[in-house]
Amino acid sequence: MATQVEPLLPGGATLLQAEEHGGLVRKKPPPAPEGKGEPGPNDVRGGEPDGSARRPRPPCAKPHKEGTGQQERESPRPLQLPGAEGPAISDGEEGGGEPGAGGGAAGAAGAGRRDFVEAPPPKVNPWTKNALPPVLTTVNGQSPPEHSAPAKVVRAAVPKQRKGSKVGDFGDAINWPTPGEIAHKSVQPQSHKPQPTRKLPPKKDMKEQEKGEGSDSKESPKTKSDESGEEKNGDEDCQRGGQKKKGNKHKWVPLQIDMKPEVPREKLASRPTRPPEPRHIPANRGEIKGSESATYVPVAPPTPAWQPEIKPEPAWHDQDETSSVKSDGAGGARASFRGRGRGRGRGRGRGRGGTRTHFDYQFGYRKFDGVEGPRTPKYMNNITYYFDNVSSTELYSVDQELLKDYIKRQIEYYFSVDNLERDFFLRRKMDADGFLPITLIASFHRVQALTTDISLIFAALKDSKVVEIVDEKVRRREEPEKWPLPPIVDYSQTDFSQLLNCPEFVPRQHYQKETESAPGSPRAVTPVPTKTEEVSNLKTLPKGLSASLPDLDSENWIEVKKRPRPSPARPKKSEESRFSHLTSLPQQLPSQQLMSKDQDEQEELDFLFDEEMEQMDGRKNTFTAWSDEESDYEIDDRDVNKILIVTQTPHYMRRHPGGDRTGNHTSRAKMSAELAKVINDGLFYYEQDLWAEKFEPEYSQIKQEVENFKKVNMISREQFDTLTPEPPVDPNQEVPPGPPRFQQVPTDALANKLFGAPEPSTIARSLPTTVPESPNYRNTRTPRTPRTPQLKDSSQTSRFYPVVKEGRTLDAKMPRKRKTRHSSNPPLESHVGWVMDSREHRPRTASISSSPSEGTPTVGSYGCTPQSLPKFQHPSHELLKENGFTQHVYHKYRRRCLNERKRLGIGQSQEMNTLFRFWSFFLRDHFNKKMYEEFKQLALEDAKEGYRYGLECLFRYYSYGLEKKFRLDIFKDFQEETVKDYEAGQLYGLEKFWAFLKYSKAKNLDIDPKLQEYLGKFRRLEDFRVDPPMGEEGNHKRHSVVAGGGGGEGRKRCPSQSSSRPAAMISQPPTPPTGQPVREDAKWTSQHSNTQTLGK
């Protein structure tokens, strides 16, 4: 029947699916696009709006024009009316009824749509028109079953012929541009993949692609005749699968290329793409494919990865059309070096490059010709060029104004303050007015790198505000005379004109050669006038000096040279005794031996000259001030870590770990001045013992040297003078060089142990200067420590700060100073001392390597737990032990105080008050910036909460510390805090500032005008005392309030804590600063003694 002819479509998909033999289900047919593939004149639709006239035609009779353009074939697409878009399905066709009947049934069922289920009217059959004309005639004779035999033969060869024909199509150079267009068109069918595979628009587009390729092999499967419904359905599945594979392959190629166009291009930079090889200019896939490289010559070469914006998009797709579908994956990277195979899938093709990374260009720069050429200079901008006779402006086109600015800034830097403070070479080249030759500046390498033109340098510096040019010389405009330095004196070149008067210059052996003197009496030699050329040349010599040798040893020559002082390192010896020793040698020695001995003596002097220079450097300290302005009274952070705090353990901590709740504080012993001095000396000796342990290896070395010297034989004084001659005298030196005393050995006891007896012996006096004369590192009574040598007397730096003032009964009627100690609830002050350990105790850090510094282990464990003082040889040890003194490492004691302050609250920690007191005393003699900043911060924080003991300790440090060592920055802080304290209603800071101005030796101080106004109200020290307020009782305890404000707090202080605020602050607020300060704040008790008004 005619209905069984139509099931196979050219696109490999069917519109009619057989449910049973002769029964067809018609699917949704979209409207057919118009264009190149429109049907021919025999088409069923033919542009007629009514499909009823064409009912005799089969449903699949839509003609389709093939790629060659001269043949037509009908597509099995059903006819439908224009604009009809609903699905037309016919279920009831059986056996292929008559044409008219079938069309009527379809029209009734379709509701406006035509379902062509009639038998085929095969007037023009596109399936057999082109390939097999006999089949076409058979179809025209309306005997469709005869088409099955030739169709089977052609269908069997379809897959092989398509594969072969596609390879042949790619090899056709004439039709090459057509696949590129097809690749762009094939993106549209890709979007229809999720839709049902039996829709016609994707299939028609695929037919147009096949038609554009001109493959005649696609027509061969369409020449098949339909056998039966089952056979044609099987044929449909086979061709549909083949068309899907082919269609998917066409869709795959452009999609992959568009998404990953640059991944393989970055890896194609290999040695064949170097600039000197123009035959590899087209570095594209044509090189890798190798077979059609001729077609890629006009294509622009791809740019490297670092120039993606110059990539030609159209040429990119054309290049990749010849590559394999999946060779742009991993295989493209591997076969990029020399591979020329197809590289299908993820293989590496036939290339031998493998995973070749470009060792020639480690950064992946692939090409340096074409557009990359102008970019190459940017990789050499960091190179500094030095020119001989060529200016940089001749090599590079630099703006002249910009170049002048560079030159000006470079030379202005040379004359800047920061550079001149370090550039001693430049300052030594300056003349007295600070000028430097412009040629010297132009000879510097950095200036030469800019220009070698002197005139350009003049032009650049013409408008400079830092330097000025005068007569081809340049100097700094501001204070040019302060920078020149005197040039270094070169002592290597001897001025022989100054040596004419030196005895070493006179050829003594010449005189002795002509003078026959007696061997035993050199002074009695009768001088013989010399008449040689050597003597005649010495016309400038004094008369006596050129006459005879004895005149060389006369005292008159020494007086002329004005060098009567010998080196202090040895006993004084006159020049006469020295030269008499030289002339007392046996006279029978030849003159050559005397000459060689003079040369040996000179070499000996030269050998000792380095040692004398070291001694001379040490001697300079004796000509300068003993105290250094910068380092005096200062201590660095490393020495702070060596401090051991010696303080009393509170009585309540010793007996009651939970705290003393009785209020009976009698643990502090009354400290007299004599007892304090004994303890202070004891701490000195304890410190001496700590350092003696450190220097023990040094003592052993000295003892070994002494033992070695004891093995030396005794010699006479003359022989010793011969072995150790005097150093040469420099005539240009105004101050004679001389070594200072050598470092002294620690103690007398150690000296007795090393040298055997305390009194100096003759052998000790005859030792060289490398052995100390006096076995004392420190003085006998006051040992010196690492910081005390900077002071004139180490005994001035006290080690113990006792509390010597006794508390007295408060008198409510007597005026008093504004001080917490005079309040009704004074703080309990404690004795505190310190020693400097020989090794550093670093604070605990997160680093494992931050262990305590090297050295011998100190006695005891310096943990947070107080440790008793170890035994040392001094009576004060028992005193310290009986009074409960313990030692702590400074940073651990500080941490414990801060923890207690945090735990108990501000102003409630007795240990914190002790730390405040230690800071106030210690910083006066050993200033440390970090310690001072912490002291100030914590004291101000306590004062804000109403606890003023720390602030009072700070003011005491200001007053006494600045009086001992004035520091401008500390003085500014003193003024600032004094103004704040007075404006808060307090008088203690102003009193300490008034005392500093009265007793300090500093003059011409710049004082704040506001502070001067406040000081004008107080003429004497008694003016700072205030009367207690009415109704205040001496034994009445007050609650603390914040300084400067009224209103008390309900917090009650522990009896042992310091009062941050004076008592009786609740009754009335402080008087404003502008008023009379006498009635400001009556919270102070009476002053117990006039002698202690400025006390601590």
UniProtKB/Swiss-Prot annotation:
Residues 77-573 are annotated as: Required for interaction with PABPC1. Changing residue 966 to A: No effect on interaction with RPTOR. The modification N-acetylalanine is found at residue 2. One of its GO terms (molecular function) is RNA cap binding. Changing residue 963 to R: Strongly decreased RNA binding. Residues 397-487 form the HTH La-type RNA-binding domain. Phosphorylated on multiple Ser and Thr residues in response to active mTORC1. Phosphorylation is important for interaction with RPTOR and the mTORC1 complex. Phosphorylation promotes dissociation from the 5'UTR of mRNA molecules with a 5'TOP motif. Changing residue 960 to A: Abolishes RNA binding. Abolishes translational repression of mRNAs with a 5'TOP motif. Abolishes inhibition of EIF4G1 binding to mRNA molecules with a 5'TOP motif. Pfam families: La, LARP1_HEAT. It is found in: Cytoplasm; Cytoplasmic granule. Keywords: Acetylation, Cytoplasm, Isopeptide bond, Methylation, Phosphoprotein, Protein biosynthesis, Repressor, RNA-binding, Translation regulation, Ubl conjugation. Residues 574-1096 are annotated as: Required for interaction with RPTOR and for repression of mRNAs with a 5'TOP motif. GO terms for biological process: cell population proliferation; cellular response to rapamycin; mRNA stabilization; negative regulation of translation; negative regulation of translational initiation; positive regulation of macroautophagy; positive regulation of translation; positive regulation of translational initiation. Induction: Up-regulated in a number of hepatocellular carcinoma cell lines and liver cancer lesions, as well as in patients with hepatocellular carcinoma with a lower survival rate (at protein level). Coiled coil: none annotated. There is a cross-link at residues 260, 311, 531, 703 (Glycyl lysine isopeptide (Lys-Gly) (interchain with G-Cter in SUMO2)). GO terms for cellular component: cytoplasm; cytoplasmic stress granule; cytosol; membrane. The modification Omega-N-methylarginine is found at residue 240. The modification Phosphoserine is found at residues 75, 90, 143, 165, 215, 220, 225, 228, 324, 327, 517, 521, 548, 591, 627, 631, 766, 774, 824, 847, 851, 853, 861, 868, 1040, 1058, 1089. Its main location: cytoplasm. Residues 97-110 have a biased composition (Gly residues). Residues 873-1023 are annotated as: Interaction with mRNA. The C-terminal region mediates interaction with the mRNA and polysomes. It is required for translational repression of mRNAs with a 5'TOP motif. The N-terminal region mediates interaction with PABPC1. Belongs to the LARP family. Interacts with PABPC1/PABP. Interacts with EIF4A1. Interacts with RPTOR. Recruited to the active mTORC1 complex via interaction with RPTOR. Inhibition of mTORC1 activity strongly reduces interaction with RPTOR and the mTORC1 complex. Identified in a complex with mRNA, PABPC1, EIF4E and EIF4G1. Found in a complex with PABPC1 and SHFL. This is La-related protein 1. It comes from Homo sapiens (Human).
